[in-house]
């Protein structure tokens, strides 16, 4: 039994050390943007009540080197796609073809940027605050353990290459009433935990 306890403690120490190493690598990968990430840590590290938010910030930063976003040029493509929809509502194939042609035309002007090098402290802090607000106030999210919260509710964007916009506010304006009014709490929990709700990664 003593050997098992020692082995467990060693593996726990190794996991924590690995997490810290990934976090330090992420800060190094940020280059000149490192100061923005450090501002997020600084914002949460002084108040004991924010200890979970600090852990959430570290989680986001640790995995951020894996993610990229389109720059603002993608907005022009989105606007063009939006203008196609009324004309192609009845024919999904023609809409898909038109979108494909538009994408091919816009692709040379679309640049991708590493999130770790471009995200601002304000953006991450707002994202963390909004995610915690959902977790603490919405019945469909209250059942999530911290690990599930980090995986499904905390991410700073829905999909890779998504521009760094205020998407949470936009989705809340569109869908909050629908989720908030749903009476089948078990259904909502299942939907959230499997990542099937708009705005959550699957």
Q: Which ranges hold each PLM region?
A:
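Bacterial Sec-dependent N-terminal signal peptides
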Residues: 1-23
């Amino acid at each position: 039994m003593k050997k098992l306890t020692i082995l467990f403690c060693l593996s726990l120490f190794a996991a924590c050390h690995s997490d810290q190493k990934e976090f330090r690598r992420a800060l190094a990968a940020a280059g000149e943007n490192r100061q923005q990430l450090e501002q997020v840590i600084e914002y949460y590290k002084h108040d004991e009540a924010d200890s979970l938010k600090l852990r959430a910030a570290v989680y986001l930063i640790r995995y951020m080197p894996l993610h990229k976003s389109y720059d603002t040029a993608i907005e022009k493509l989105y606007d063009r796609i939006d203008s196609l929809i009324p004309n192609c509502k009845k024919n999904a194939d023609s809409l898909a073809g038109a979108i494909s042609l538009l994408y091919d035309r816009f692709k040379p002007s679309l640049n991708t940027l590493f999130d770790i090098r471009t995200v601002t402290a304000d953006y991450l802090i707002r994202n963390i605050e909004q995610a915690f607000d959902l977790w603490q106030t919405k019945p469909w999210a209250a059942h999530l353990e911290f690990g599930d919260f980090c995986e499904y509710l905390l991410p700073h964007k829905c999909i890779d290459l998504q521009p760094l916009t205020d998407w949470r506010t936009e989705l809340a304006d569109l869908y909050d009433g629908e989720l908030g009014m749903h009476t089948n709490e078990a259904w909502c929990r299942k939907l959230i935990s499997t990542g099937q709700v708009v705005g959550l990664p699957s």
